[in-house]
Amino acid sequence: MSTRWRYYNSKRGNGFRGRGRGRGRGTSLTAVALPRDDNFHKGAQDGAYFKDMPMDPEQFRDETVLSLSFAQGMLGAAYYEQSSQLLKIMNDISEDLEFRFLKRLIDDVKPTLIIANRSQDLEFIKFLTTRYDPQEKIYEDGTTEEGTSEDTVPTWDSSLAYSTDETTAEKEEKEEDEDDDDEGLPAKLNKLPNNFFRMSRAIERLKAMAGSHDSSMTEEDKYIIIKMRFDIEAVNMIRSFGALLLFLDETRMGVTDDPLSVTSPIKSIKTFTLGNLVEIDFNTIQALDILPKETENKKTFGQGRSLYQLMDKCRSTVGKKCLRKWFRNPTTDRDDLVSRQKCVHYFKQDWNAEVTAKLSSILGRVKALNSVFQKFQSGTAQLIHWECFVSTVNALVEILNIIRQTPISKEFPVESDLLREVSEIAVIAGSIINFAESKIQGRVTVMNGIDEELDEIRDTYENMPMVLTAIAKQEEARLGLPPYSNVACVYIPLVGFVLSVPRDYGVESQPDMTLLYSTHEDLRVRNATTSRLDDEFGDILMRLIDSQTAIILTLKTRVMKKKRSIIKLLSIASRIDVLISFGLIAAQNGWNCPALVDEPVIEAVELYHPISVLVVKKSFVPNQVSSGRDGIKASIITGPNACGKSVYMKSIGIMVFLSHIGSFVPARHAKIGIVDRIVTRMFTVDSVLDGMSTFAKDVEQVALALRKATGNSLVIIDEFGKGTMTEVGLSLLASVMTYWMNRGADRCPHIFLSSHFHALPNYIPLETNIATFLTFTVLREAGGKIKYLFRMTPGLVDCSFALSVAKEEGIPPPVIGRACRIYKALKAGTLLKEIKAEVSNDNEKQLVEDMDVVLADEDGFMAAVESFVKRKKTSFCESSMRNVSEEIEKERSEASTPASKSRSTITARSNSVLSSRSMASVDQLSVLDALLPKKKKKKVTGSSMESSMSPDPFQEEDEGTEGEEDQISAPVSRPTLPSVQKYASEEEKQQSINSRHSFSTRTAIHIPTPIQMGEAGGVKRPRSTSTSSPGPSASKSVRTEVFKKTPNVKESQVLETPKQLSISSFLEPKFPSSEKDVISRVSERYLQSDPFKTPISDRRSQQSSRHSTPKNRSMNQSLIQSARDTPHETIRSSNEVNPEFFNIFNFPDDSILKSQDTYDPNVTPRSSSRRELRPDVSHSQNSQFGEVFSELGTQFSIFNSQQSFPGNSMGTTNPDCSIFDDFFANSQDGEKKIDSTKTSMPIVNSDNFIFKTPEPRSSEKQRSLLKNKGQASNSSISPSSLILGQLAFGDVDQTPRPRGDNPIEFQYDVVDDDDPIFEEKNCSAPVFEFLKSNDDEEDDEFLKSFLETEGSLHIDTSADETIDRSKRS
């Protein structure tokens, strides 16, 4: 190979190695010794240079090139095997300056060639050079023995930077390492320039490789492929990977005979993990909150805390570094993990607290010595470095002496000789350096008694002041100067001895005196005396410093010889610090030791999240975990939103991680098999710079799990597939699970999957007996509020309670109501595109103007009726009572006026039913109220008002007014069916703006009296206060006839019911066609419809009476009078009218237009998620009184939602209304609080009439009734019913439960061994039993037929296959 390559370059005229960029120019590999460069040892003589010479088989070998990159304490690598043409990469791992993992990596790979960046850490280069390239020397000026290097960064010189003793020791260690290696040639080191390892160049090379098979790919596409296939966060791995590819391109390894366009063959790229390490990527670290974020504030106050911050109780710097290293590199070495667990157990015990506290105190004095050793090496160590060294070494010795006396001494093996040597170094350093004097002198000084010569010099220097004073006196006398003339002999370092004389002294007169310099006070001169002192003492201070420096250098040399021993003790101390931290955390939080086993199982009892338990405001609920037992390794978790699925799965991941770093786990008991990697799809790191969508990142993480997960891996997936279409997400998730489950229990990883795709069990192979289903228990409190218990239980649910979560988070009720209706439509099988849209109040004006067309279009009218029946709103408009007092007086005066004036007033009222203010409270409007148009106020005469009236389809035609009726019914031709639907839905947006204690004029019930029998019927008040007018007129002849048939009724009594709307009191618009046609159309439409209904009662309305004042009560009495005499009630109060007359439309039993003539005190009407309210219609108990009030029992009325309103058992024709006197008398007290569960109204029976509020099913009476009727059973939670129970209520506490049930949790039957589902699929799903009723058989048939049908990809919200299993068995 090398022959062809050299031959090619020589023919080009390039004398340098490698492919040149032109004649006479080399490449960046000029200074690199390429492999087998000795093939041309014979040179070019005899033409051998240009001939193909056979290679010596002994010299030939396949190359294994290892590329290394080390920076910021992280090591990345990649290597290429020429024999197999495989390229393998290793993600970044944490590495210290001992390079233990680097040694293990080289031993495992056994490379023949190592390439490294010569500009990286000097310790890294030194480690490689001393072992794999000891001959080559790189000097500090950037030159080598072969010439000048292209790299201008100063690099390390092993011969100059270290002492001879240390170099010899390293050479000996290298020889020992070589002896341990297998047979074969040693690896050769090539130091490449820094541009080979640049990140940008590596990315470009990877892009070129990714787009080699498709030239049409853009740069963005190539980058996305790289992002999805490689971990870009592993910077050192990417750098080494790119450098390796560039090196292969430069050397053309394996393709020397091919054209230049051919690159080195790479069959596959794989990721490898260093032995005994658990692979964990960056996304998993972030998802499980293992390490803190780089930008995270230190003061988190419990929010955003990481596991590392929780576990960091280390007292030393080396301990913190060791803890981070363990977190970066969890191990699979079971012996090492068991050893750590023993130490943690020892430090956790209370009886070892004294030893633990002592060790922690000493560890606080241990410092990192890497920088200290560098200062020692460069000779720039100062006093602070020596203090740090001596303090640390003494602390290390003390710690090891304590550990050797404990039962865990075997876990920290230290040779006695090594400990003795380090102890000697500490003693020697402490006894040589005088730290007290050094602080005064500002330099390192040596103690007395270390060196005799040094002691003599020090004594001489200390006695020098007395000597110089005596000499100064002698010179003063010799020079003839007067006493006290300031003559002095001075010693100046580096200058010597000088004589100081007064300035007026004549230096020129003395021939042996030389002037050196002068000051403003004296002259400094030299003479024979100073020269004699220089000869005798010399520069004594410098001699003293030099002597001390020589001793310190000797001490430094001896310390550096013991550097490795000291570093080893530092490593032991760091491990002790981390294990003490683990023990303190375990004792503080009550963690326990996990049992490490070889079998692939993950089991735990009372497991909880260690971080969430610290920040949660209430007690945390632990759960159990089981995976791998009996071959079940896939746990599919479903349940409501915000029930704790993600926290549960994170707890599992953290438990497994903690067990692989030797820590205790937050569980009572745990059994964990060793895992080789932890892969998650929980956390998505979004960035606008990477060009990838959120779903693409999710797919990237799942793809990583599919590529790397083995039978001993842990895979955690949280709601994968939610970032795209439901069908596509479900398909991908089902395919991923099928892929793993088909591999079998041995090769399938431990999978913990949470999803809201409730149809997932239908698309995975349950027959493999690998999957199990889990869910969380919830309670339904009063008012339909969901209470999460966060308790795991086996089972599978088909609802997520997303609407409840949305309500709790403040989503407006109209939005939730619309979502609930869409959900019910989808659950009923309606396609999403078939669900009609709804509009807001923005186009209300236009819709009101078009309402006349509705009554002309019968189909549109029927569709509007259906839309109204499905509405579930119960709020009231407080503003409707502002002008009610004036309207009442006006209506009373109009009651005795001629019929023509009454009709005109009623006509004016009907035009203003849906005013702007009445639209703010459209809760429980009657069907025709919702359809009547809203007209602007106009000051017109009665005839003009009548001309604009819309037809009344239920109006009883009077012979005397027939002509007038025909005159005002002018149908409009253009259709407005879409507007009808929008208008009906638009009313529901105003459900929550009404006051809690508002009054409704529709809550009044008027009992006819003899006085009123001959008078005109009362009118029903509109909701609006802005436009108020009398109600619709009825046939005077019919009303008079009915009144005459009830002569025994006493004076009018006003009945005020709890605040509850009776929807049966409708206005009566006229149809543009005949009455029979209308009746047949309504009957046919309602017989075909089967709306989903949930009976709801407004408990707040039952307390409205206590807020009423005498004035309001009088107004309510008038309203009751006005709301009573509608044509429907008139028909029912007549003896001549057939009791079945009002039911002639044949509406469904739960329709609000059908009279409820049945009362069964033992049956509580209800609804489920799949069926409407179906009361048993029977006329055996019907009575005339029941006929009058039966229409009050609607789906929104208390008389039908919980308890039907009974008729008079005596069958009397004219009921005595005096029975209500006591009730109305009690309601006068405005401050009296009415309990919703106590008697607040009379209901008619054989003895007396008592109106009673509905009793919840939790009461003893209801329980006994259900028991007698055989209806007591478990209840399933209907999400739609649950949400509808809260839509219109501002106060949750006062909201009744939609179905009157006790707060329940999910109930599951015991698994039946004979059940074919469990026998074949082994899926532990829950059993939701519906409340038993006469319609259960119908529902069972529906469920069976639904489950037998072929599944589709649309949203599947049906119950799972195990529903009602007890009945089948």
Swiss-Prot record:
Taxonomic placement: Eukaryota, Metazoa, Ecdysozoa, Nematoda, Chromadorea
Ranges of compositional bias, category Acidic residues: 173-184, 954-967
The protein's role, per its UniProt record: Crucial component in meiotic recombination, functioning at some point after the initiation step of recombination. Plays a role in promoting the crossover outcome of meiotic recombination events. Required for formation of normal meiotic crossover, and crossover and chiasmata generated by artificially made DNA breaks. Together with him-14 and zhp-3 plays a role in the activation of DNA damage-dependent apoptosis at the DNA damage checkpoint in pachytene cells.
Listed GO biological process terms: chiasma assembly; homologous chromosome segregation; mismatch repair; reciprocal meiotic recombination
Region spans: Disordered: 138-190, 880-915, 935-1135, 1153-1182, 1248-1278
GO molecular function: ATP binding; ATP-dependent DNA damage sensor activity; double-stranded DNA binding; mismatched DNA binding
Family: Belongs to the DNA mismatch repair MutS family.
Assembly information from the UniProt record: Heterooligomer of him-14 and msh-5. Interacts with the brc-1-brd-1 heterodimer.
CDD domains per the UniProt record, alphabetical: ABC_MSH5_euk (cd03281)
Species in which this protein is naturally found: Caenorhabditis elegans
Residues noted as binding ATP in the record, renumbered to the chain: G639, P640, N641, A642, C643, G644, K645, S646
Biased composition regions of type Low complexity, renumbered to the chain: 1024-1037
Name by which UniProt lists this protein: MutS protein homolog 5
Pfam family, one: MutS_III
Localization, UniProt: Chromosome
Composition skew (Basic and acidic residues), residue ranges: 884-894, 1073-1084, 1254-1263
Tissue: Expressed in the germline.
Keywords: ATP-binding, Chromosome, DNA-binding, Meiosis, Nucleotide-binding
PANTHER family named in the record: DNA MISMATCH REPAIR PROTEIN MUTS FAMILY MEMBER (PTHR11361), MUTS PROTEIN HOMOLOG 5 (PTHR11361:SF20)
